Amino acid sequence: PKATGIIVTDLMYKHWDEWVTTAPHPFVADFDGNAISNIVDILNGEPYESPMKPWGGIEQLAWNTTSDKVAYTCRKKTGLEYAISTNSDIYVYDLNTKKTENITEENKGYDTNPQYSPDGKYIAWQSMERDGYEADLNRLFIMNLETGEKRFVSKAFESNVDAFVWGADAKVIYFTGVWHGEVQIYALNLTDNSVRAITEGMYDYGVPALFGDKLIAKRHSISMGDEIYAISLDGKTTQLTQENKEIYDQLEMGKVEGRWMKTTDGKDMLTWVIYPPQFDPNKKYPTLLFCEGGPQSPVSQFWSYRWNFQIMAANDYIIVAPNRRGLPGFGVEWNEQISGDYGGQCMNCLLYTSPSPR
């Protein structure tokens, strides 16, 4: 029988679940309300991706406030150099002059996800410092578009800045970030670079959007999938969707608690413990030890469709999920300790620091 195949002569040949055969490009066009015209490929004739595969989306592109410039994320490399490098940059394409400017050329790690401020005076983006290090600290930078001055504004937050959105007055940026096993929404004051937590509790928040004097964001936890919430800037939350209420009303979830315990080298480590729905402290239960992969990804209040703790607990297991060494949310040193020590202290955290359920 006939067979097909792919001959690979260079990298990058595959991203997770897809072969690399095409490169997405950003286009701009005129729109009169009915149809588009004057279509322009910003990367015409170039072999580069924007948005970048495999995860990039529309968040890697941004219009300026006067709609005559487009900022985009791109790693302008090919072959082996592309495969091993994280050196992407923020480029600004001028629709009038057709010229492109690299505004992050001096930084050698990831630069991604540009956003212009509402007043048109600044541009913000996420930035990692080191080339080839995908788990580097994800920092927030802003640049004054008139002077070119750049500032690392999230220095007070010793963890990754995830999704972010400008405040209406361009004096505050709201962002999500993981800290101590929870992903909360924070307010970054650009006057003094101070950071204030807006939300709290055993939840993970995601993709905040500004709507008047409130934020709209999704929220989930170990015990509930995503729902949409309105968040006042003082932290008050209002649930807007109840997509799965009828299902949840029929279920009994297990108790979730966080415990701090000492590691073998004397550090404090947060561990999530999830109990069976009808836990009896007088009974003995088998325990499942959850070993987070990545390796540098957090054990937060995530709701997983693959590793769902509540489904495990519903089968009469106690789940132990340590935030072992080598993941974000506990400072840079904690996250980076695993580099060069994979199988060392992180395994000690998993195997020799197990709590006894009370």
Locate predicted features.
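Conserved small/polar residues in nucleotide/adenosyl-binding loops
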Residues: 352-358
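A flexible loop/linker signature enriched in serine peptidases of the S9 family
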Residues: 1-25, 45-57, 73-89, 102-112, ...
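Short beta-strand element of the alpha/beta-hydrolase
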Residues: 283-293
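Blade-terminus and WD-like Trp-Asp/Gly-His loop motifs, strongest in beta-propeller folds
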Residues: 61-69, 114-122, 164-172, 208-213
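Non-catalytic accessory segments flanking enzyme active sites
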Residues: 3-8, 12-42, 59, 69-71, ...
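Conserved alpha/beta-hydrolase
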Residues: 316-329
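Catalytic nucleophile-loop/oxyanion-hole region of alpha/beta-hydrolase
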Residues: 331-348
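Short loop/turn segments that connect beta-strands within beta-propeller blades
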Residues: 31-34, 94-98, 145-148, 189-193, ...
